[in-house]
Amino acid sequence: MLLRFTKMHGLGNDFMVLDLVSQHAHIQPKHAKQWGDRHTGIGFDQLLIVEAPNNPEVDFRYRIFNADGSEVEQCGNGARCFARFVLDKRLTAKKRIRVETKGGIIELDVQNDGQVCVDMGPPRFIPAEIPFVADEQALNYPLEVDGELHSIAAVSMGNPHAVLRVDDIRTAPVHGLGPKIENHPRFPQRVNAGFLQVIDRHRANLRVWERGAGETQACGTGACAAAVAAISQGWMDSPVSLDLPGGRLNIEWAGPGTSVLMTGPAVRVYEGQVRL
């Protein structure tokens, strides 16, 4: 059978988006891995699936597969594209929608200027909820990699993140250290690794090594986690403007117990069909 899909991106973080509300198919990890290959498939960072909800209090179910076939809890850049997609495809007439993910319920708001604001919910810091192996909760944790200690913040935005502060984003060891942090045994479900260079109280640069995808042009949940870590430790104040390789995201967070708001673009690239 042929499935219709849309290729989209949020700041260069690119997605294949499938509507499984009006189409019906059983998507398996092997399909994501096959389609995600940039040489022999469609090529993407993540596959986003739109489904009818299980929960009557939400509008849609939102599933995410990495290009390596692993299903993950959350994707912030994908959430913005998800909101744009369901509106463009007339699956809803609402500009503000609620969707369920493996990481919890999030709210998406398509603004008049085309930007999308995502209410990502409150960050989580309790190690067992990230999950991260630690004796007690702290703002910073020493993490040993190849005999060297690195200071990290550990945060969940519905998916796990480690945030490291660096002096210069251009020389940050994203490709050397990133995969080692991703697969560190203290993160039992693996982790996304963010490398943050603070410019001033409201501006910073960020690169993210994403779990199951490698370095991407942008990572929405990574931007949220980095902003939360920086505000928590007194390095920055809300609102935070983060420049990633693919462009800029704006993050607001009022402090513990409150939701993180992320605003950025969502762009449709092309429509296609793929054989299942």
Swiss-Prot record:
* Major subcellular location class: cytoplasm
Q: Per its UniProt entry, which superkingdom is the organism in? A: Bacteria
PROSITE patterns recorded for this chain? DAP_EPIMERASE
Q: One biological-process term from Gene Ontology? A: lysine biosynthetic process via diaminopimelate
EC class (word): isomerase
Amino-acid positions noted as binding substrate in the UniProt annotation, renumbered to this chain: N13, Q46, N66, G76, N77, N159, N192, E210, R211, G220, T221
- On whether Isomerase is a keyword of this UniProt record, the answer is yes
Active site, renumbered? C75 (proton donor), C219 (proton acceptor)
Q: In which pathway does it act?
A: Amino-acid biosynthesis; L-lysine biosynthesis via DAP pathway; DL-2,6-diaminopimelate from LL-2,6-diaminopimelate: step 1/1
| Enzyme Commission number, as recorded | 5.1.1.7
Spell out the GO cellular component terms annotated for this protein, sorted alphabetically and separated by semicolons.
Answer: cytosol
Q: Which PANTHER family match?
A: DIAMINOPIMELATE EPIMERASE (PTHR31689:SF0), DIAMINOPIMELATE EPIMERASE, CHLOROPLASTIC (PTHR31689)
Quote the subunit structure annotation.
Homodimer.
* Biological function: Catalyzes the stereoinversion of LL-2,6-diaminopimelate (L,L-DAP) to meso-diaminopimelate (meso-DAP), a precursor of L-lysine and an essential component of the bacterial peptidoglycan.
Which HAMAP family does its entry note?
A: DAP_epimerase
Q: Which family does it belong to?
A: Belongs to the diaminopimelate epimerase family.
From the Swiss-Prot or TrEMBL record, give the protein name.
Answer: Diaminopimelate epimerase
Please give the organism. Answer: Pseudomonas putida (strain W619)
Q: Which gene encodes it?
A: dapF
